[in-house]
Amino acid sequence: SDFTGYALRTFVSPNGTLRTVIAGCASGPTQWERVDWSADTPPGTSVSLRVRTATTEADLAMARWVGPFRDRPSELELPPGPVSGERFAELELTLDSGGTMTSPRIDRLTVQYNCPL
């Protein structure tokens, strides 16, 4: 029998998350504009994004999540945003297999922001 196939269907999580912290403008407030990603999303799978911001990296743990954003690129100033203009942003990408035997894969993540004068 093929225990590998059984193990993949039985013991591997069908969903996953990827989190990363981005430091915005060194001078402080940051206008978070857009997040885009390149992904392989087989039929039935999906990728969504949540964002939270804080003045310090340590304060991110207590910040409120905004999202999920499902479109790419995700305009962070539009619903379900806007994302507040704090210096640090934490991005959380959720990869969902949708109950299929395949998973999405992220190839690239791009964050666009502006530093107000």
Outline where the language-model segments fall:
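Beta-strand-rich ligand- or partner-binding modules
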Residues: 1-117
